[in-house]
Amino acid sequence: MTQAKAIVAVVLLALLPQLLHSDFILTMFVFAFILGMLAISFNLIFGFTGQLSMFHAAAFGLSAYITHIAMTSLAVSFWVGLLIAAGAMFVLSAVIGTICFRYKLKEFYFAVVTLAFAEMARLVVLNWNSMTNGSIGIAVTEKPMLWWPGRGLLAVAGTPMWYYLSLVALVIVIAVCSRIVKSWMGRCFEAIRLNDELAGTLGINVFRYKLLSFTIGNVIAAVAGAFYAFYIGYIEPDYLSIAQSLAIVSMVLLGGRESIIGPVIGAFILTALPHAIRLNAELRLLVYGLILILTILLMPRGIFGTFMRRRQPNVAATPVTPAANALKAKP
């Protein structure tokens, strides 16, 4: 997507609340924006670096709990609580990543170990009743405070305000991740995804860049988790569940993991679909599983990747180059 098209898309989305007076549709967009951030952050680890992390849902859910606990226990604002949660995820991700990457875990083994850490986090949340309220969850009544042009400092309450806040956050995440992917760091990610052993022989510090990808992705997931919980006003252990991890993987594979925009498309579809056909929680898992199977079999590049491939039949959506070519032209 060119810069001009991106600007037009953002302007149209900014005008949408003025054109549509449906709170239901705006609510779907808010969820899609927040889950779009989550999908992009996962794709940074999975799509661009080739690491199938099953800890992502845990980072998403833990951040919601930490933000709320910081606000209530330390009497700080939402934004300070979010910084504390992001910092906690940075440290926790660095520890988990160091353990995994020092032992050179990858593919199936990396997925299993990160899943084990995620399940440990879920069990802590589920059983630490004094802090998390266990399986009952926490009702969130606090609101983020934000300065609005012409209106001063206001609590972010109501769907229209959350719409603009989540849209701005999504645009920032897209811009930051696009910059990362196009940078020298992004080329190192690509080289590691293609062949991490060859990347190491070319002088890339594989441990360092895998750890960077894992940590950055989880910190962005932490932001998405806090936004999600404070928008719906409730936090529960299911945020850290395997079902949530499956949903994240489905978003990325459906939209396409070879781009930044692809996961956002997947998030929009999987946000709207369950509400459009009135699916309950159990049927959603079945749908996510079917989507994973059909996408892998019929559209391995995802919706966005398949569209770009058909639009430019002689050029892949993201050129698949040897690891050595991925490192040309160091800035």
Segments (PLM) and residue ranges:
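Extracellular/periplasmic helix-loop junction at the C-terminal end of a transmembrane helix
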Residues: 117-155, 304-306
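Transmembrane alpha-helical segments in multi-pass inner-membrane proteins
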Residues: 57, 210-298
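Helix-loop-helix "hairpin" substructures at the membrane interface of multi-pass membrane proteins
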Residues: 157-236, 330-331
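Hydrophobic alpha-helical transmembrane segments
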Residues: 3-8, 28-29, 33, 58, ...
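Single transmembrane alpha-helix segments in multi-pass membrane proteins
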Residues: 17, 22-74, 99-109, 189-191, ...
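Cytosolic-side transmembrane-helix boundaries in multi-pass membrane proteins
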Residues: 1-14, 139, 194-196, 201-208, ...
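Membrane-interfacial amphipathic/re-entrant helices at transmembrane-helix boundaries
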Residues: 1-37, 75-81, 322-331
